[in-house]
């Protein structure tokens, strides 16, 4: 079993994503992510600027951000975003303890500003997801730039 497979299911379980949902999205994610790239965060999310666009699934690894969309009526999957983290700019996130949510925003290489809202249910999980995002986007980038 490769690194991605070993880390994807525990990350999805940690976020409370049902196995049926994970199974539907897994083939799309597998095509986008290298087998040696561990999953850091897997969660459902919505686009706050387009609330009727259906549900999204966000996968964050140490190298990529992949987002799939599932349509409301037919439950069809489509790849919404597949970006190398080095190609994202102006990445930010805003933890909201009052609503137990985290909003993530990033500008993709094509110049489009993407925003996703993760509802987490409990305030403790908000801080945990905040730490995961810090680890990937701040700590790892700092260590990579120091090594170069």
Question: What residue ranges belong to the model's regions?
Answer:
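Anionic N-terminal interaction surfaces
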Residues: 1-59
């Amino acid at each position: 079993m490769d690194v991605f497979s070993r880390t994807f299911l525990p990350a999805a379980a940690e976020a409370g994503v049902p196995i049926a949902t994970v199974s539907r999205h897994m083939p799309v994610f597998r095509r986008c992510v290298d087998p040696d790239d561990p999953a850091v965060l897997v969660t459902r999310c919505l686009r706050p600027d387009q609330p009727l666009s259906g549900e999204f699934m966000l996968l964050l690894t140490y190298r990529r951000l992949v987002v799939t969309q599932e349509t409301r009526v037919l439950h069809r999957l489509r790849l919404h975003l597949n970006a190398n983290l080095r190609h994202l700019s102006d990445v930010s996130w805003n933890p909201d303890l009052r609503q137990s949510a985290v909003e993530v925003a990033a500008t993709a290489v094509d110049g489009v500003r993407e925003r996703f809202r993760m509802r987490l249910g409990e305030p403790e999980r908000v801080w945990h997801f905040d730490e995961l995002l810090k680890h990937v986007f701040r700590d790892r980038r700092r260590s990579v730039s120091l090594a170069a």
